[in-house]
Amino acid sequence: MKQRHLKIWLAWAGVLIWCVLCLYLSSQRLADTTRLSAALTHWILGLLSLPGQTWYMPVFDGLRLAAHILVFAILAVLLWPALVLTTQNAHKSYLYSLGACGVLAVGSELGKLLIPGRHCSLPDMLLNFLGCLLGTGLTVLLRRRFAVGKR
């Protein structure tokens, strides 16, 4: 019994830590988020030995778009095991995970209305939700492939 409780706490701790990191990143001012994206863009250009004059903006823009998808895909992947351990219902946990991710996907964009220099973006909201769908789909595939969470 104690081991099950520990697994539940650890699963939810992972979700909470990820949510705090996401909240921190989405609450940054525009200058700060641009600086972080620029640093990552330079790192990627150097890693792939791409010329900055040609590739800077495509990589910068692609990175910012991919970040929306990746952040919420990871959240969905973290949420499912926490929910399945808590509810002990794997099938409903997919829906709960997708629903919770969807609410957070919309809420993170709406929260930007309160941050100076940031704006709420419907395309970003849709990218966030796409990440939720992809993450949930990935958990379905992983569960089928490795029989994780089957009882």
What are these regions (language model features)?
Residues 1-116, 122-123, 129, 133-151:
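Bulky hydrophobic segments
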